[in-house]
UniProtKB/Swiss-Prot annotation:
Protein name: Cobyric acid synthase
Function: Catalyzes amidations at positions B, D, E, and G on adenosylcobyrinic A,C-diamide. NH(2) groups are provided by glutamine, and one molecule of ATP is hydrogenolyzed for each amidation.
Species assigned in the record: Cupriavidus pinatubonensis (strain JMP 134 / LMG 1197)
Protein family according to the UniProt entry: Belongs to the CobB/CobQ family. CobQ subfamily.
Active site: 328, 432
């Protein structure tokens, strides 16, 4: 089990790399995260929902993602509440106190999934959540040491040296653990190191002498990895890219409950695109394309967007010939009305959308979860689309008669998705990952005004990044010592 001294210490990345290292060695390996809290999720082949990181780790392990790899997924809908997804299906909505009381039930799901994986695979590489040293969360813990103790799992502790204080993080974390938990930690990985390793060696020697535990290795800071980010849009992603040769400027407003921002990974990596995320209080700069992202709380995020003064800026953007795309929750914002009569995403009621597309959306009790494939409806050449749907909204109206995509269902029938405005400036779709296929990316960029647009093969970039990550772990970690417990 890989645990971290902090959030974003590199647990997900290390687990992905270890999965590929073990898969290369011919092992049947599966990733596992008992409990994940994230708004970035993926859809499994059987129509379940898991954390995006576990889907990436499954790819690294060269296996199909399965709901057992992330049995408990928490999708925050407010600062104090979340949708609880068990074995891939939304079960209930709870506030923090109610979920704490529910944890014994959640642990049953965790243990059942873990048992199935251990029966099916040679090795299960487990990822913790946040830090095991959160004293207030120790009671009924199912994500870190509470799980490790229950299944008798050895733990490797990862710390991020790039943020500073790495030795305090490691020693302090150990000090907060119980004796049995401390004994369970077999050693350390120091992540994201830049500089001369010889200057770090005295600190490593001190750490090993102080704790009696080995440092399995120091991983360098790896620039340019094209791997799915799990949670918040990190600073490097939010900042101006400053691509000198970029020909198309794309803006994405960052909403409080933005979901599946991995939709923009292909644009982030595209050499012809200058992708920028704008946060609260920032003006909408001149752009060719504005994309309204997915949201876990669409009406609340629509209120936030308006409170920031972005609606007049978007109307001005369209008036001067700019293009707008809405994805999932963003699609719902582009219609006339959003209705939530049962209060699935907050207080019951209705909100006026922007009205740029003629349809209304009603939030239903059952979530649509499916992988999809098809093509762009209005492209000058065949443009294949591949992605997934995760939404509770059902949209109806005449605007949907001019679809954005044609999707091929499993039964062989073709169905319409999304909408496109009569003037061709506004496009909406429920499909996440709409930019991921090279021909779809090329077609959408051409529609947005980029003449000579080229597609980008995000899948190939992701696979190359996994290989590079595995090479780095193999060359910088003492894998023999770290995997010793597996041979017992």
């Amino acid at each position: 089990m890989v645990q971290g001294t902090t959030s974003d210490a590199g647990k997900s990345t290390v687990v992905a790399g270890l999965c590929r290292v073990l898969a290369r060695a011919g092992m049947r390996v599966a990733p596992f995260k008992p409990q994940n809290m994230a708004l970035n999720s993926a859809v499994t082949a059987d129509g379940g929902e898991i954390g995006r990181a576990q889907a990436l780790q499954a790819q690294a392990a060269r296996v199909e993602p399965h709901t057992d790899m992330n049995p408990v997924l928490l999708k925050p809908s407010s600062d104090t509440g979340a949708q609880i997804i068990i074995h891939g299906k939304a079960r209930l909505d709870l506030d923090a106190r109610a979920y704490h009381a529910y944890k014994p039930e959640a642990m049953k799901a965790v243990l059942a999934s873990h048992e199935r994986l251990t029966q099916a695979y040679d090795v299960v590489v487990v990822e913790g959540a946040g830090s095991p040293a959160e004293i207030n969360l120790r009671d009924r813990d199912i994500a870190n040491m509470g799980f490790a103790e229950r299944v008798d799992c050895p733990v490797v502790l990862v710390a991020d040296i790039d943020r500073g204080g790495v030795f305090a993080h490691l020693v302090g974390t150990l000090d907060c653990l119980s004796d049995s938990e401390r004994a369970r930690v077999t050693g350390f990985i120091i992540n994201r190191f830049r500089g001369d390793i010889s200057l770090l060696q005295p600190g490593l020697d001190w750490l090993e002498a102080r704790t009696g535990k080995p440092v399995f290795g120091v991983l360098p800071y790896l620039h340019g990895l094209h791997l799915d980010a799990e949670d918040a849009i990190v600073g490097a992603q939010s900042a101006k890219r400053g691509t000198p040769d970029a020909l198309l400027r794309v803006i994405v407003p960052v909403l409080p409950r933005i979901s599946n921002h991995t939709d923009f990974d292909a644009l982030r990596a595209h050499p012809q695109v200058d992708l920028r995320f704008i946060g609260p209080g920032m003006p909408v700069p001149p752009a060719d394309l504005v994309i309204l992202p997915g949201s876990k709380s669409v009406r609340a995020d629509l209120d936030f967007l308006r409170a920031n003064g972005w609606e007049p800026a978007l109307r001005r953007h369209l008036r001067y010939g700019g293009k707008v795309i809405g994805i999932c929750g963003g699609m719902q914002m582009l219609g006339r009305q959003i209705h939530d009569p049962a209060g699935h995403e907050g207080p019951a009621g209705s909100s006026a959308g922007f009205g740029w597309l003629d349809y209304e959306t009603t939030l239903a009790p059952h979530k649509q979860l499916r992988r999809v494939s098809g093509r762009l409806a209005d492209a000058d050449r065949e443009a294949a689309v591949s992605g997934y749907e995760i939404h509770m909204g059902v949209s109806t109206g005449s605007g949907l008669e001019r679809p954005a995509l044609w999707l091929d269902d499993e039964n062989g029938t073709r169905r319409a998705d999304g909408a496109c405005s009569e003037d061709g400036q506004v496009l909406a779709t429920y499909v996440h990952g709409v930019f991921d296929e090279p021909t779809a990316c090329e077609g959408l960029l051409r529609w947005a005004g980029l003449d000579g647009a080229q597609g980008i093969d995000l899948a190939a970039l992701r696979e190359a990044s996994i290989e590079r990550l595995a090479d780095t772990l193999a060359s910088h970690l003492d894998l023999g010592a770290m995997f010793a417990p597996l041979r017992r």
